[in-house]
UniProtKB/Swiss-Prot annotation:
Pfam families: Ribosomal_S15. This is Small ribosomal subunit protein uS15. One of the primary rRNA binding proteins, it binds directly to 16S rRNA where it helps nucleate assembly of the platform of the 30S subunit by binding and bridging several RNA helices of the 16S rRNA. GO terms for cellular component: cytosolic small ribosomal subunit. One of its GO terms (biological process) is translation. InterPro entries: Ribosomal_uS15 (IPR000589), Ribosomal_uS15_bac-type (IPR005290), uS15_NS1_RNA-bd_sf (IPR009068). Gene3D superfamilies: 6.10.250.3130, S15/NS1, RNA-binding.
Length: 88
């Protein structure tokens, strides 16, 4: 889980204000942070299969949110993936 301070920072950066944590861009940023943190965890704990299930669920949720954002607002999609460096 991400702490509240980091969520506020991501909300300001991607959503415009610290209370805009429900914006799609902010949700994607939070999930990306969690995914990056779990990648580091799995480098040291290769046999942690139970956490891997949650990791895959987070990846799938982010994938769905990115697809939705791409359909709804393509410009915002492009800026989000460039800021997060998650696609080419």
């Amino acid at each position: 889980m991400t702490d509240k301070k980091l969520v506020k920072e991501l909300a300001i950066e991607f959503g415009g204000s610290e209370k805009n944590v429900g914006a799609i861009e902010v949700q994607i940023a939070i999930l990306t942070h969690d995914i990056e943190r779990l990648k580091i965890h799995f480098e040291t704990n290769k046999k942690d299969k139970h956490s891997k299930r949650g990791f895959i669920a987070k990846i799938n949720k982010r994938k769905k949110l990115l697809a939705y954002l791409k359909d709804v607002n393509f410009e915002s999609y492009q800026t989000t993936i460039q800021k997060l460096k998650i696609r080419k």
